[in-house]
Amino acid sequence: MADLEINDVSMSFVDRSGKGLLALDRVSLAIENSEFVCLIGHSGCGKSTLLNIVAGLLAPTKGAIRCAGTTISGPGPERAMVFQSHALLPWMTCYENVRLAVKQAFKGAAASELKDRSEQALKLVHLEHAINKYPFEVSGGMKQRVGIARAFAVEPKVLLLDEPFGALDALTKSSLQDELVRIVEKTRTTVVMVTHDIDEAIFLSDRIVALSNGPAARIGRIWEIDTLRPRDRLKLATHAGSLQYRKEILEYLYKRECVPQGMGER
């Protein structure tokens, strides 16, 4: 059984004029245990909408999503989400931000267990030295590390990432990508990530799923990324297979024509 099953999901919104807009149209996708899937596509095609539906933050207009065999009806501890914004509480230390999530996920656990889980999560992202620092005292990259630690601390079945490195400089982004790969390989967590960065998708993914242009977006194409793991960033830069993936994805994104606006109305 797949860890995550997206079954014939459609999502409609109503604008201020009362007109309906079909954002997603009958999207179906099965994501296997420990698989890393990246969602790509033009801005506004519904990638983040789909991720929010998987997170339980939005309810689909039609269709259903199952996680570990259970139909999703709202947020749950088996799914954790990391956004582009770190979303840390500024009056709490890095440790306290992580502990707050752990306390919610493991209700009734002893204080010693909560402390251990929180500290281990920060250790996982190499932030032992920043455990008592406040968000304003650490860099943007370190804030995102705390966000990732908070997500892994609750031991989710599925990790959802919405452009978590999009606002970071290239070197910090590369470092966090490497950290993410290391942690995912260690924890065997299933990951669904939204990104606009093609190279990031190729480096991280087992599969890259491209949505068609919206409105009424569907799955346009899927690439199976079969380069061997662990992946070497420098070797991938000149690897023939990776270059071919990059070429095909760029061609897809640049040549894809928009669906006429009227086709998205319902």
Describe the function of each predicted region:
Residues 55:
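Helix-to-loop junction immediately C-terminal to a conserved catalytic motif
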Residues 92-101, 202:
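Short coil-to-helix segment of the ABC ATPase nucleotide-binding domain corresponding to the Q-loop/switch region
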Residues 82, 148:
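Hydrophobic anchor residue at the start of the ABC signature
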Residues 40-42:
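The feature captures the beta-strand-to-loop junction immediately N-terminal to the Walker
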Residues 63-75:
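Conserved ABC transporter NBD signature motif
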Residues 133-136, 154:
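Conserved signature/switch motifs of ABC ATPase nucleotide-binding domains
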Residues 1-3, 12-26:
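A short, flexible loop at the N-terminus of ABC-type nucleotide-binding domains that lies
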Residues 110-130, 182:
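Conserved ABC ATPase "signature" region
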